[in-house]
């Protein structure tokens, strides 16, 4: 089980560090996991969803969707950390639950794949579609994962929701491109739009950070001293 110090050194997302100094953590945190069980659960889900999604979307769109979903998960997680810091200042009482937390894992990207398959299952089947997707099973699995995120502490549900929203959005664009039979160019444009949305949310988060920058700098300095970073 990696320590908090190890997680920070290996690229985990910690909002004050990510937004004040190292934005690459939005990406690198997708590949770090908190122990073997965390890694195995996400890789099992990636195998289940990914093996179908790659064959449906093609390799390029599959990879693009996966990365955009993971980034959106990290960004929405950061947005929630920002809102918690606003609440911490407004409350005037030190509440540990509102402090930024270290987060990592591929679950946002994986949930994006799950959402993409769920959306496809709910839409009329395309003539060229190679798989019949079980909508009841997919809705149940995705709903259960979301519910567990709200019921169990320590799960970054904001990352899950961000990944799901991006996965659903890019799947709708892919579906439209298949109906129009202009898949290659339209798919590239769709991925660029997805990435642009990530950039916009990142810029929005940077704007929101300005009023809480002194607080985050203080929190970051305290963590660096405690962990001897």
Describe every region a protein language model picked out.
Residues 146-229:
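C-terminal transmembrane module of polytopic alpha-helical membrane proteins
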Residues 50, 116-123, 166-175:
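Hydrophobic transmembrane alpha-helices
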Residues 63-67, 110, 138-143, 161, ...:
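Hydrophobic alpha-helical transmembrane segments
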Residues 40, 44, 75, 110, ...:
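Active-site His/Glu-centered metal-binding helix of metallohydrolases
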Residues 1-104, 151-155, 218-226:
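N-terminal TM1-TM2 helical hairpin plus the immediately adjacent luminal interfacial "cap"
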Residues 72-77, 115, 148, 197:
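Alpha-helical transmembrane segments of multipass membrane proteins
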Residues 99-120, 159:
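Membrane-interface micro-motifs in multi-pass membrane enzymes
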Residues 55, 120-135, 175-188:
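Alpha-helical transmembrane bundle and helix-membrane interface signal
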């Amino acid at each position: 089980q990696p320590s908090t110090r190890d997680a920070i050194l290996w690229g985990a997302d910690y909002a004050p560090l990510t937004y004040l100094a190292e934005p690459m953590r939005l990406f690198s945190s997708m590949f770090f996991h908190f122990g073997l069980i965390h890694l195995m659960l996400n890789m099992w889900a990636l195998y289940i969803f990914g093996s179908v999604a790659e064959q449906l979307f093609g390799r390029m769109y599959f990879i693009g969707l996966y990365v955009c979903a993971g980034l959106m998960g990290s960004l929405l997680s950061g947005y929630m950390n920002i809102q918690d810091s606003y609440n911490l200042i407004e409350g005037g009482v030190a509440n540990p639950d509102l402090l930024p937390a270290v987060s990592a894992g591929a679950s946002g990207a994986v949930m994006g794949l799950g959402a993409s398959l769920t959306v496809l299952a709910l839409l009329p089947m395309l003539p060229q579609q190679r798989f019949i997707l079980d909508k009841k099973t997919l809705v149940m699995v995705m709903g259960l994962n979301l519910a567990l995120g709200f019921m169990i502490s320590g799960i970054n549900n904001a990352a899950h929701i961000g990944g799901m929203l991006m996965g659903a959005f890019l799947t709708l664009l892919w579906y439209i491109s298949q109906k129009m039979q202009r898949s290659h160019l339209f798919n590239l444009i769709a991925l660029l739009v997805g990435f642009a949305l990530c950039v916009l949310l990142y810029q929005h988060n940077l704007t929101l950070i300005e009023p809480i920058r002194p607080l985050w700098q203080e929190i970051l300095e305290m963590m660096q001293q405690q962990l001897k970073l």
